[in-house]
């Protein structure tokens, strides 16, 4: 009898069996319809890696700690997860990548919540494992097609706001907490009239005593209308609809719709995938863009031996739904290597991405024509970073300068103008064939000669750098 199969006909025998007898199947060839997962496994001393990998496959699918008589009431060989390959992690002791295949029928259609409940559930507390990290998931086309995905996507967003050929510019309003609704709206107006495309609620802003959500929405929409009238451009502000209950979240979204705002916002990890998918479907029905913030992600993804890599959270967001998501900047104050960051940025934006371990992509992923998500670069960036940001992210991104706009010595509007001039100069230089990375300083200095706003920003931030080594490196 093959130990890689569960044979009910062999008869029920109580007791505890090694997981590897049933769930380690190195001869298995994954099917096109399987959900594939790559786990970084660190077993406890004395636990063979084959047993550890099989335990992950078992505990995240059909297994439990002992043999149960109800195993004989179903065809476990059809439903079990299979650890089909194990590779050592280069440069690391006692760490392996275990590849596990899950049958499609284990997962509810259109539910990111259900996928994560299985794959990153109780197995992460398993005593036989010292640490466990989900590095990547391959979602088969058969499952991808059960999700709506982004409410609109990159192409439709550009058509809605009538802006092409460059990244979009944004700004998070600061201070993040404490402003009254009227002063908050004034800050939004100054940024938008100065040249930004979007402004943003900080993720912390919901409906606090100093600024209730309804008041904020009203003053912000007034700022949008005024700035559009002055500039002739379509403007927007990410109104954060995240709330304590789904009912309150939807009430805020409905009010934003009444105001005819073009875009709203949700904190998808703290708010939860069920709430996020609900909001994304509503946004498509109502023609409103959805900006996604990733507050809480570093708690989950920053440690390289335990947790969930952000590329998994990014893929799950594309399925759940969002038109923008924060991805880090590579050059700013937040964690992120270039190769790894661009790996998950491509997974957000492209229709088809090939396996590429040099960028942390463990599986080829086909999105079956699902719309792409705009990457948002935000966190500790200023005008001197503009050439690098354009070189790294290209056009389909939102470059979001909070302190890099509001910290301008002349105020918000000049800060916005400085960023817009720097961006337009970099786009022009790129289109002329200049090397953005090699000529970065020259490009910015040339533009600053005829823009006093940019010159002042360049002088203020000329010494500001964030040169720390990334914690989570490939």
Curated annotation (Swiss-Prot):
**Family classification:** Belongs to the RuBisCO large chain family. Type I subfamily.
Cofactor requirements of the protein: Mg(2+)
Instruction: Describe its assembly.
Output: Heterohexadecamer of 8 large chains and 8 small chains; disulfide-linked. The disulfide link is formed within the large subunit homodimers.
Q: Which Pfam families match?
A: RuBisCO_large (PF00016), RuBisCO_large_N (PF02788)
Q: What residues sit in the active site?
A: 174 (proton acceptor), 293 (proton acceptor)
Its domain of life reads Bacteria
Give residues where N6-carboxylysine occurs: 200
Q: Please give the CDD domains that the UniProt record associates with this protein.
A: RuBisCO_large_I
- UniProt lists the gene as cbbL
Cellular localization per UniProt: Carboxysome
Q: How is it modified after translation?
A: The disulfide bond which can form in the large chain dimeric partners within the hexadecamer appears to be associated with oxidative stress and protein turnover.
Say what the protein does. Answer: RuBisCO catalyzes two reactions: the carboxylation of D-ribulose 1,5-bisphosphate, the primary event in carbon dioxide fixation, as well as the oxidative fragmentation of the pentose substrate in the photorespiration process. Both reactions occur simultaneously and in competition at the same active site.
PROSITE patterns attached to this UniProt entry: RUBISCO_LARGE (PS00157)
Which SUPFAM superfamilies does the entry link to? RuBisCo, C-terminal domain, RuBisCO, large subunit, small (N-terminal) domain
Q: Protein name, please?
A: Ribulose bisphosphate carboxylase large chain
Per the record, its GO cellular-component terms are: carboxysome
Reaction catalysis annotation: 2 (2R)-3-phosphoglycerate + 2 H(+) = D-ribulose 1,5-bisphosphate + CO2 + H2O; D-ribulose 1,5-bisphosphate + O2 = 2-phosphoglycolate + (2R)-3-phosphoglycerate + 2 H(+)
Q: Please list the GO biological process terms of this entry.
A: photorespiration; reductive pentose-phosphate cycle
Residue numbers binding substrate: 122, 172, 176, 294, 326, 378
What's its top-level EC category? lyase
The organism's lineage is: Bacteria, Bacillati, Cyanobacteriota, Cyanophyceae, Gloeobacterales
